[in-house]
Design a protein with these regions (language model features):
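A structural boundary/capping signal
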Residues: 1-327
Length: 327
């Protein structure tokens, strides 16, 4: 198959000329391999963490052929991989990670273990660990490199994909992929997992700690509320969502909002409604005015140089958004 085969507009890269973002945010997950201790040391949203990585898991050369992938899979299956999986699951529970955060963590671990030239070892390791966590993932090959093929619970935009048995498999690799580049899938489905990776936040991510909250002043909110207003935002969370895959708006609107952030917003609005003795109808109109006029209007391309729907915390952090974020 080619990368464009069976794909439609929702998966293809945008043909709009990209601008330059106003500010770049770094992913708040840093990983390095500690070979002497057989583990990966992490700076995870400001917290030190350690994930065991047994030498028995370390793969030698893997080529982008099904036989080589099968041999690597067998080695990993016979390795001491459970401590690694248990450590990742433990971090998932402690920090309230969603599925995309788990994938990002697994990816960072594999990149700490293997150099940039060892793309295939990275991809096989990612596929193996995610499958042990019951996620449905596959791999394919593009030229000499393996790529991850990931189905999602939601529709994803601006990422190329192929369709296999009515399931969209989104392509994540380490090299640019042309629209006519042949992509080969393997007949053997190594992963037995059935869970689709979801982009939604069904619970609050506990990352960064209280010291990482940044007080953000909102001049337009202050003007509408009639007093100075600021809101605490978990900066590591905003850094994490900066490069988030683009999905349907409901993914953003239905995601859980940070507790400290929501309490501050609700407290400020509630006090204004009570202070002014608003009726229910007046309160609704007031809140709608706040949502529609409390942010500077900026297009995605002005802010980020690309299409990017915003989570609620991001709208507050940047103090700007556009129509789709105000729905």
């Amino acid at each position: 198959k080619t990368a464009s085969e069976s794909s439609n507009a929702h998966g293809m890269p945008s043909d709009v000329e990209m601008g330059f973002p106003e500010a770049m945010l770094d992913m708040p997950i840093y990983a390095s391999m500690n070979s002497s201790e057989s583990n990966v040391d992490l700076d995870f949203f400001g917290f030190p963490e350690m994930v065991p990585f047994s030498s028995s898991m370390k793969l030698d050369e893997v080529i982008a052929k099904e036989k080589s992938v099968a041999q690597a899979w067998e080695q990993l299956s016979n390795s001491e991989y459970m401590p690694t999986v248990e450590a990742i699951n433990g971090m998932k529970d402690r920090y309230g990670l969603n599925d995309w955060a788990v994938y990002t963590l697994v990816k960072k671990i594999s990149e700490a273990v293997y150099d940039e030239s060892d793309v295939n070892q990275r991809v096989v390791t990612q596929m193996f660990l995610l499958s042990q966590m019951k996620y449905k993932v596959r791999t394919g090959s593009v030229g000499d490199e393996l790529v991850m093929l990931i189905p999602f619970a939601e529709q994803i935009y601006q990422v190329q994909y192929i369709t296999d048995k009515e399931l969209d498999m989104y392509i994540f690799g380490y090299s640019p992929l042309g629209t006519n580049t042949p992509l080969y899938t393997f007949t053997q489905d190594f992963s037995m997992g059935e869970k689709l990776i979801s982009l939604a936040f069904t619970q609050q991510m506990h990352v960064g700690g209280d010291m990482q909250y940044k007080k953000v002043n909102l001049p337009l909110w202050s003007e509408i509320l009639g007093e100075d207003f600021s809101v605490p935002i978990n900066k590591p969370y905003v850094e994490f969502t900066y490069d988030y895959p683009q999905s349907d708006l409901l993914t953003y609107h239905h995601s859980v909002v940070d507790t400290q952030t929501s309490k501050a917003v609700l407290r400020g609005v509630r006090l204004k409604i009570i202070k002014d003795g608003m009726t229910d109808e007046e309160a609704v109109a007031y809140i709608l005015n706040l949502v529609q006029n409390g942010f500077e209007y900026k297009t995605d391309y002005e802010m980020f140089g690309r299409a990017k729907p915003l989570f609620i915390e991001e709208s507050l952090y940047y103090g700007a958004n556009n129509c789709k974020d105000r729905v």
